[in-house]
């Protein structure tokens, strides 16, 4: 169980110019440490997002050393508001949202397709990031209905059934993998549990649903460390599965260490250190997918290596901040772990630099939902490491996403995952990515 150090907690919420002033005026620390050792968030007032895990489960970096946090604008805030209103109106009567089938990518009306767990979970995480809880927020009702939809999907699924939905060939499944429903649903439950839930019975249902998802995810791992039935770009599903298990483990849930170890090795194998390039065999030949997955999967260990070296330097154990296996061993890390951390750090640094290139960000050549997912993975990994790379990435994303938002507030894809619900939820997560950072700076 990994604890959060000092004022550092996990990310998840929203961003905009001016929100830092709101947090400056707030004197309440919205975090509490429970008997199980997990750091959770006390439900904040509406529009005061809590520090939580992000969609991809990255730890909060030390932003005070690198940035003022003000990269957003009134244009972004207006865009987020329009997007959130569109998402609210797109919710189905069953509490869910749907992406539709791969065979009917032309259907863009959200009420003309059945709700699916993957899309619903993605929207739920966007609601959480944008300042909503089960108790408070402009879209709290929508979030409660989201949670109920997903809990029922898991509870009604037999233990011996691999998937939590009978729907097949949905856009997320075909492009991101057959297991994507349970993977994103697990991530949603983990994020939700970061808040204190006063209803003991409800909390137990969420925990049981999460544990059931974890079991199904672990059973779906392939022998190479990736995940079975990976869809068009298997590396993306595997990266998301890795994230879901990592964050669940951080929440104190039981996760098989061997499964995680195999998963990280699989992701690292998608970047060739010797040639400093991505291996695209399992990313549909698209470098963006491979790089974003590798960058994300190596981010946690890369950050750990950096923290160990910086701490050893500050206490006098090391005279320089250079991340090598030798220095990690001097800092007290075992030889085996030191080599693993050094490798992860090198891969993360190299893949992040590659991921900022315009030819990589172009992805398939036009934007589909999988491009948006890849952008999000790349950006959050950059945020975790600190520095200015994430600002460069955010500027590119802001310039791109604001231009292509539809007049009704939605976004949609132009190939593969065309669903406006799926794409809008992901774009909301991207544009609101740094609100956690601004709040975390105030807590230092």
Regions found by a protein language model. Give the residues of each.
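Sec-dependent N-terminal signal peptides of Gram-negative exported proteins
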Residues: 14-22
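Bacterial N-terminal signal peptides that target proteins for export
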Residues: 4-15
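Preference for long, amphipathic alpha-helical scaffolds in soluble/luminal domains
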Residues: 2-4, 21-444
């Amino acid at each position: 169980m990994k604890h959060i150090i000092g004022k550092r907690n996990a990310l998840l919420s929203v961003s905009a110019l001016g929100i830092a002033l709101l947090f400056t005026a707030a004197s309440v620390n919205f975090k509490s440490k429970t008997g199980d050792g997990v750091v959770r968030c006390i439900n904040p007032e509406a529009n005061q997002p809590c520090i939580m895990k992000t969609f991809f489960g990255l730890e909060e970096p030390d932003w005070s050393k690198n940035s003022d946090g003000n990269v957003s604008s009134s244009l972004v805030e207006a865009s987020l508001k329009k997007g959130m209103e569109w998402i609210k109106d797109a919710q189905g009567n069953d509490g869910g949202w749907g992406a539709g089938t791969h065979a009917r990518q032309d259907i863009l009306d959200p009420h003309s397709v059945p709700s699916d767990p993957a899309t619903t979970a993605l929207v739920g995480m966007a609601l959480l990031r944008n300042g909503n809880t089960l108790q408070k927020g402009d879209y709290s009702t929508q979030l409660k209905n989201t949670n109920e939809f997903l809990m029922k999907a898991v509870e009604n699924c037999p233990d011996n059934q691999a998937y939590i939905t009978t729907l097949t060939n949905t856009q997320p499944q075909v492009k991101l993998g057959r297991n994507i429903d349970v993977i994103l649903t697990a991530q949603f439950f983990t994020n939700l549990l970061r808040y204190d839930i006063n209803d003991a019975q409800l909390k137990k249902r969420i925990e049981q649903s999460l544990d059931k998802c974890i079991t199904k995810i672990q059973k779906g791992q392939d022998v190479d460390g990736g995940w079975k039935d990976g869809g068009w770009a298997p590396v993306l599903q595997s990266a998301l599965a890795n994230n879901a298990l990592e964050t669940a483990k951080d929440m104190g849930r039981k996760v098989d260490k061997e499964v995680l170890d195999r998963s990280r090795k699989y992701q690292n194998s998608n970047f060739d250190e010797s040639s400093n390039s991505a291996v695209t065999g399992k990313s549909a030949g698209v470098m963006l997918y491979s790089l974003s997955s590798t960058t994300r999967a190596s981010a946690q260990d890369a950050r750990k290596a950096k923290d160990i070296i910086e701490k050893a330097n500050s206490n006098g154990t090391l005279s320089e901040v250079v991340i090598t296996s030798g220095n990690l061993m001097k800092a007290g890390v075992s030889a085996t772990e030191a080599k693993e951390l050094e490798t992860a750090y090198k891969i993360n640094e190299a893949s992040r630099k590659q991921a900022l290139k315009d030819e990589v960000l172009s992805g398939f050549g036009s934007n589909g939902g999988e491009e948006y997912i890849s952008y999000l993975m790349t950006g959050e990994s950059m945020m975790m490491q600190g520095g200015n790379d994430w600002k460069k990435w955010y500027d590119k994303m802001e310039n791109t996403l604001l231009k292509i938002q539809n007049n009704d507030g939605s976004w949609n894809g132009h190939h593969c995952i065309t669903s406006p619900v799926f794409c809008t939820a992901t774009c909301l997560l991207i544009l609101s990515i740094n609100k956690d950072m601004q709040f975390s700076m105030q807590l230092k």
